Amino acid sequence: MALPDFTMRQLLEAGVHFGHQTHRWNPKMKPYIFGDRNNVHIIDLAQTVPMLSRALQVVSDTVANGGRVLFVGTKRQASEIIADAAKRSAQYYVNARWLGGMMTNWKTISNSIQRLRKLDEILASEASGFTKKERLNLEREREKLNRALGGIRDMGGTPDLMFIIDTNKESIAIEEAKRLGIPVVAVIDSNCDPDQIDYPIPGNDDASRAVALYCDLIARAAIDGIARQQGAAGRDLGASAEVPVEPALDESSEA
């Protein structure tokens, strides 16, 4: 396995270079702006390429070291893509709504996850003895909890890295990550504040094709990390295993 490859052409075809209208910009993004066309800022892809490569390396390294990556993207055009990418790479996701305290109040979130698991058990049991109305209420509760927490139910604790689409919309998630010292990889559009992001990726965060490209690359970087981790585990096992020594032949038995 190796880090996923991508080209400038792919970025252009996905519309990664298109920012927002010039009047909507965040002046802190000036270093990443190439210019403007028809009152729309054009993001400097010559900077996006190395910064995206660095982000992919961080994701791979985190997973290779046994870390967990949380994908966050709750807006309509990112929601399904985020979930698919996280599932494909055996990572975790929040794609419906970020609940305040999702990271900083993990104990409460854990209790809700336990409740979700309990509901799964109850509803899976044929001999539960509930009325139709009671069962319907339990199913609604489970659906609500699963929509909010289904992507992190098996995470087992706070993540080691977060990947975020739309830093303006996910500002609470970023604040919580900062408070806990969790590094953040995020796409920063021309209307974003790059200061809060540890590993920024300058680019369009609205176009579905662009979002799909980022998520695919991040997922593949995580898969590369898994392969590296398994490879290292295999080497460790190989190094620790004793090489069997064949017994020396008895000269008398050769005769």
Swiss-Prot record:
InterPro entries: Ribosomal_uS2, Ribosomal_uS2_bac/mit/plastid, Ribosomal_uS2_CS, Ribosomal_uS2_flav_dom_sf. Signal peptide: none annotated. This is Small ribosomal subunit protein uS2. Belongs to the universal ribosomal protein uS2 family. GO terms for cellular component: cytosolic small ribosomal subunit. GO terms for biological process: translation. Pfam families: Ribosomal_S2 (PF00318). SUPFAM superfamilies: Ribosomal protein S2. It comes from Sinorhizobium fredii (strain NBRC 101917 / NGR234). One of its GO terms (molecular function) is structural constituent of ribosome. PANTHER family: 30S RIBOSOMAL PROTEIN S2 PROKARYOTIC AND ORGANELLAR, SMALL RIBOSOMAL SUBUNIT PROTEIN US2M. CDD domains: RPS2. Keywords: Ribonucleoprotein, Ribosomal protein. Residues 235-255 are annotated as: Disordered.
